[in-house]
From Swiss-Prot:
Its EC number is 3.4.19.3. PANTHER family: PROTEASE FAMILY C15 PYROGLUTAMYL-PEPTIDASE I-RELATED, PYROGLUTAMYL-PEPTIDASE I. Disulfide bonds: none annotated. It catalyses: Release of an N-terminal pyroglutamyl group from a polypeptide, the second amino acid generally not being Pro. Removes 5-oxoproline from various penultimate amino acid residues except L-proline. This is Pyrrolidone-carboxylate peptidase 1. One of its GO terms (cellular component) is cytosol. InterPro entries: Peptidase_C15, Peptidase_C15-like, Peptidase_C15-like_sf, PGP-I_bact-type, PGPEP1_Cys_AS, PGPEP1_Glu_AS. Belongs to the peptidase C15 family. It comes from Photorhabdus laumondii subsp. laumondii (strain DSM 15139 / CIP 105565 / TT01). HAMAP family: Pyrrolid_peptidase. Its main location: cytoplasm. The lineage of its organism: Bacteria, Pseudomonadati, Pseudomonadota, Gammaproteobacteria, Enterobacterales. One of its GO terms (biological process) is proteolysis. Keywords: Cytoplasm, Hydrolase, Protease, Thiol protease.
Length: 220
């Protein structure tokens, strides 16, 4: 049976919860499209998050890895297109680190594109009535850090497992309603909707070896 690894983060920036973990942990030991789901929580800490991620990949030996993170202020599920090789932290991480303009991997390429079928995922979500779009930037904080580190690891250190390429990428999710009440005017999404959206994303990733040709770009 195939195995899928889904990761999420601990709370950060003064929040009591992180919607990524609240939703991802609902998926532990579930089966989707014939695959077994394993979940792991990552620390919201530069470098340590990647150490934990790589350990989980080595332990689980997944065919697919999707990292999930909080994007407070975004109104929909956003599937990330690209990760860039830069740390530029607006706020300190959970251990007080605040790297500014440092590379994630000193000898790594400038960027990595997601290897998920990002447009098929967005299309599947929209068809199910879940607001979703493609994001052209994962930011420069730990979500981008993890996405870049994941794709670098899969491309170079862990290129193949069980005879096939391991695909990976990142999905951002909005605040939960209980977070949004503390940030007036900020959009939110119900936990049940986010959890359903992640199941759809996993199914789409497992069922589509390639992507579909629909518009997902932006003018600016």
């Amino acid at each position: 049976m195939k195995t899928v690894l889904i990761t999420a983060f601990e709370p950060f920036d003064g929040e009591a919860i992180n919607p990524s973990w609240e939703s991802v942990r609902q998926l532990q030991n579930q089966q989707l499209s014939g695959a077994h789901i394993e979940t792991r929580q990552l620390p919201c800490v530069f470098n340590t998050s990647l150490t934990c991620l790589y350990a989980a990949i080595d332990e689980i030996q997944p065919e697919l890895v999707i990292a999930v993170g909080q994007a407070g202020g975004r109104p929909d599920i956003t599937v990330e297109r690209i990760a860039i090789n830069i740390n530029d932290a607006r706020i300190p991480d959970n251990q007080g680190n605040q790297p500014i303009d440092t590379p994630i991997v000193a000898t790594g390429p400038a960027a990595y594109f997601s290897t998920l079928p990002i447009k098929a995922i967005v299309s599947g979500l929209q068809t199910a009535g879940v607001p979703a779009s493609i994001s052209q930037s994962a930011g420069t904080y730990i979500c981008n850090h993890v996405m870049y580190g994941l794709l670098h690891h899969l491309a170079l250190t862990y290129p193949k497992v069980r005879g096939g390429l391991v695909r990976g990428g990142f999905i951002h999710i909005p605040y939960l309603p209980e977070q949004a009440v503390k940030h007036p005017g900020t959009p939110s999404m119900a936990l049940e909707t986010i959890t359903m959206a992640l199941k759809i994303a996993i199914n789409q990733a497992l069922e589509n070896s390639g992507d579909i040709a629909i518009s997902g770009g932006m003018t600016h």
